[in-house]
Amino acid sequence: MRGIDFIAIDFETATGRRASICEAGICVVRDGRIAETRSWLVRPQGNVYSYWNTQIHGIRPDDTEMSPDFPEVWTEISEYLRACPVLVAHNAAFDISCIRSSLELYGLDKPVVTYYCSLRAARKLYDFRCNTLDYLCGQFGITYGRHHRAGDDAEMCARLFLREIKDSGSPELEEMVFCNGKL
């Protein structure tokens, strides 16, 4: 899939607030191949966690006590976005709202980015009873790491979206217009 470049992204949050990012993960895809996967623990404002969120991802205040805050991590992620301003997320509405809320909370500029949603693509392309990331990866034999850990989820999202591009018959990422938006 030459010419298919994007960054799959995933966030875990400490509470129900979208700006409470406690882990960020990216998976860089260049020419249709995974080039790099990274994740960062992030100290959310106040380092406060809800019981329910911790039960989902297992990240605790002790894990992020000495971690960088969102602006520091976003500076690193922004370097990747300058090279490739195309994001993909599974349930992009959640992840994009995390970005928007965090940028607003910290008074940071919004980048010019196009995003695609692998969940919307799955709903359009397939007729599965369930469209969660782990279920879809299981259906396609995509090996899964630790579910609800941002780096692993970002990589699985990238692998799934590459499959969706192939299954859509679209040789160009831009043709996946049924699942995109602007940050």
Q: Regions from the language model: what does each represent?
A:
Residues 1-2, 158-183:
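Acidic two-metal-ion nuclease catalytic site recognized across multiple nuclease folds
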Residues 153:
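Conserved catalytic/binding loops enriched for acidic/polar residues
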Residues 73, 156-157:
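Short Asp/Glu-rich motifs
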Residues 99, 121, 157-161:
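Buried hydrophobic packing segments
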Residues 109-122:
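Conserved beta-strand -> loop -> alpha-helix junction used to position metal-binding or nucleic-acid-contacting
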Residues 1-112, 127-130, 134-148:
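Conserved non-catalytic scaffold segment of RNase H-like nuclease domains
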